[in-house]
């Protein structure tokens, strides 16, 4: 075998794709030096050992290394039931979903048995909800970063108009934020961000007492709360100072409540202790502060989810799961054996990012996941689904393949790394069923043939966004939108519909030198707007487009708060650092409540009167 042939064989054996198809359908070849570099980074995971986990769907039969003799299935409670192979020597798995062990004499093999589909509320057909960038919300005393308290008025509006879901931006624990902060580059996805949890909601007496004792702190909190944009480093420092002061007040003046905090920490056990030790090392400070901060965050979001469900929301809060984590964060450090050490996640060049994207994050190694029985993936799902009614998985295609590149390399010099899609899907569906948690998979961009159909068959909803929901003939009419999807007018990476209609994103990109011929781009956008106006047949394209969205057969429609408020500037401009205020804009201090109520009623009425 020649050197090139051996390299290609080794690459394919490791799950790398030496050839891939770009957005235009062109076949692209990965350079040999890229394959060698990525293979070298994968070598430690390839040599690791562990206990594998088989997965299956209820009613399937699996091939296990046993004999035709007596065997049994053992459930999580230790109860046994007989197991018998079929005529082909395969073993039919139990009909009850769960984590089982097949046992034959001393031989035990773990098998996860998943239901056919992810969970969905039985009586919910065409629901709707709101989507919030939590850090952008406003509430008194938020100290410059929107938090859980800012959700309350929006949950009240949701209840008033019969909505069923409230989708959150990522709430993962972060690194000490700098000016380039992104919620999609977390320190640890298994734990929560205390900067976006309200002390005034969790411990109001202690929080106010801390401000009374420290008047300079109180003054700084008031000033930061009124700011138009987020100063992440300054606001984070302010919130941590307040949190430490509130913890001391709680310990001294409210021993009963402090006892509840300590009881929760004891129940969380070694996992919390390990995280807090790493967080204190990464961020500096006292591990006790981080433990208290996690209680505050857990308390706030659990309370809000319960409140939403008790007020009639069939789904409640929807979490957002980032595709990876910071390579120097707590998650990567605590699970180093499961991570893609020396590799960075990103995206290949496409029509929107001609140089590709390097995201500055790492993720799980598929080789390590298999050898560790998928334990890191399962624990992550359980952490994110806890006290939530849904989870949106950013870049769901990462369950199938991810673009990886050596750290520091150009995003063009990457390669697709394949993941065990069926095993990961089975585990995702099983945990969804166990947690009663809806699953949404963000499937925008270049999607391999058949993947959307596979996800839909397992009850994982895709995402359809108005500017992209079209074919060669133009924008799709409402009845042609996917049923197994979430319908949205925009996302955090796009301008709100009002900004898209006016070309705000194009002007920003031209200002940053990313568009050379702005007049031509604006002319194309005007043509798109005209086509959309012709489709909706209304006097106000923005409102009528929301009406079209509401009338789709999609199982769920989500209205970002920026669209609900009629804003025009987008949250994040992908591919930019510094030139655009990514993740820093806050919602206005005041809004036109009558216009907002009218828009919410418009969407709600469209869902009630649309397709069954």
Range-by-range predicted roles:
Residues 11, 100, 158, 278, ...:
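Conserved, mostly hydrophobic/aromatic
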Residues 40-44, 59, 75-78, 84, ...:
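Acidic/aromatic-lined carbohydrate-recognition and catalytic surfaces
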Residues 43-70:
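Extracellular ectodomain segments of secreted/surface proteins
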Residues 71, 96-105:
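Short, aromatic- and glycine-rich surface loops/edge beta-strands on solvent-exposed regions
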Residues 182-212, 331-355, 414-425, 460-472:
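Acidic, His- and aromatic-enriched active-site or binding-groove loops in soluble protein domains
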Residues 293, 297-311, 373-460:
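Active-site neighborhood of glycoside hydrolase catalytic domains
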Residues 314-376, 380-383, 402-417:
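Substrate-binding/active-site clefts of carbohydrate-active enzymes
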Residues 443-568:
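Conserved alpha/beta catalytic core and glycan-binding cleft of carbohydrate-active enzymes
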